[in-house]
Curated annotation (Swiss-Prot):
Binding site residues for Mg(2+): D51, D91, D227
Provenance organism: Haemophilus influenzae (strain 86-028NP)
Keyword hit for Transferase: yes
Cysteine disulfide links: none
Lineage, opening ranks: Bacteria, Pseudomonadati, Pseudomonadota, Gammaproteobacteria, Pasteurellales
Gene Ontology molecular function terms on file: ATP binding; magnesium ion binding; selenide, water dikinase activity
Protein name: Selenide, water dikinase
UniProt keyword Magnesium present: yes
Pfam families xref list: AIRS, AIRS_C
The protein's Enzyme Commission number: 2.7.9.3
Gene: selD
Active site: U17
Cofactor requirements of the protein: Mg(2+)
């Protein structure tokens, strides 16, 4: 009798970027009464919830540093490692940089799962690093109750090309590089409701590198970028708005989703992270239908880039996306800060 295949998602209480601590709770954790340490060379710290830290070397080049890790969102160990690494590397691309090195972070229940499973996870991470043109240069591991994997990633960028999430301008159009719905499809799979024709769609999206961010950083009209991950499209857009002192409008009819997403919402395949996200920032968002909430607050794992671009540079980024095979689509626009508490309106 054949052995049952190991299903990694059965060994974790959370999944992918849905494991993130909610924005509301995270704000409490990060609050500190200690005097802030000031370093004039630290161009980007944690003040605006940006994707990575950026340090000016003083010679026209800056170092980008980030880390990201989570528990399994798929059952296959190799795919889990690949997705986790792709997601971590994305933070470098979201700042407009070029990754140069990855360091692995591994937590593994050695008394529950065989070491060969961990080997496949790390190999998946190594594969993603090679796709990004970097080495998996080392790492650290611990024995933990649940599988955890991710990377610490170092990148470089011309100092003047850094794309912060707090440098957007009013009038910019907003574009996305991947469809939404990753959290919904992976939840449907975990519940055993995913149809055969939708198998692998979420994995393919999560494994798509956001390397186009390095090219977007060369476009002066691109004023801000971030990758859409655990806080959903609305959460990460709110970070851009609050960091840049702006408001935004999202065009719900232009949002692209993975196939089957709306049907799975109707079947109740909405991850727990969606509710936690809305609880954290729902008061900053205009009226939403339940379906809009499920899509726009859906926690993405290794999601796409959200790009703020001035109208006169829109055609440039469309051409870049076309040349690299990325299905770029408009999702909204930025406008002057509203006098009300509503940061993002959904139309």
């Amino acid at each position: 009798m054949a052995e049952e295949p190991i299903r990694l998602t059965q060994y974790s209480h959370g999944a992918g970027u849905g494991c993130k601590i909610s924005p509301k709770v995270l704000g409490t954790i990060l609050h500190s009464e200690l005097e802030k340490f000031y370093d004039p060379n630290l161009l980007v710290g944690n003040e605006t919830a940006d994707d990575a830290a950026v340090y000016d070397l003083g010679n026209g080049t800056a170092i980008i540093s980030t880390t990201d890790f989570f528990m399994p969102i798929v059952d296959d160990p190799f795919d889990f490692g690949r997705i986790a690494a792709t997601n971590a590397i994305s933070d470098i691309f979201a700042m407009g940089g070029k990754p140069i090195m990855g360091i692995a972070i591994l937590g593994f229940p050695t008394n529950v799962l065989p070491a060969e499973v961990a080997q496949k996870i790390v190999d998946g991470g190594r594969f993603a690093c090679h796709q990004a043109g970097i080495a998996l240069a080392g790492g650290h591991s611990i024995d933990s109750p649940e599988p955890i994997f991710g990377l610490a990633v170092t990148g470089v960028i011309d100092t003047e090309k850094v794309k912060r999430n707090a440098s957007a301008k009013s009038g910019c159009k907003l574009y996305m590089t991947k469809p939404l719905g990753i959290g919904i499809l992976t939840t449907a799979e975990k519940k055993g409701k995913l149809k055969p024709e939708h198998q692998g769609l979420a994995t393919a999206a999560m494994c798509q590198m956001n390397s186009i961010g390095s090219q977007f950083s060369q476009v002066d009209g691109v004023t801000a970028m971030t990758d859409v991950t655990g806080f959903g499209l609305l959460g990460h857009l709110i970070e851009i708005c609050e960091g840049s002192n702006l408001s935004a409008v999202v065009f719900s009819d232009k949002i692209k989703t993975l196939d089957g997403v709306k049907d799975y919402i109707a079947q109740g395949c909405v991850p727990g992270g969606t509710g936690r996200n809305f609880e954290s920032y729902g008061h900053k968002v205009g009226a939403l239908t339940e379906e809009q909430k499920a899509i726009l607050c859906d926690p993405q794992t290794s999601g796409g880039l959200l790009v703020a671009v001035e109208p006169n540079s829109v055609q440039t980024i469309i051409e870049i996306a076309k040349d690299t095979g990325i299905d770029l689509y408009e999702v909204g626009k930025l406008k002057p800060k509203s006098e009300s508490d509503i940061v993002v309106e959904v139309k």
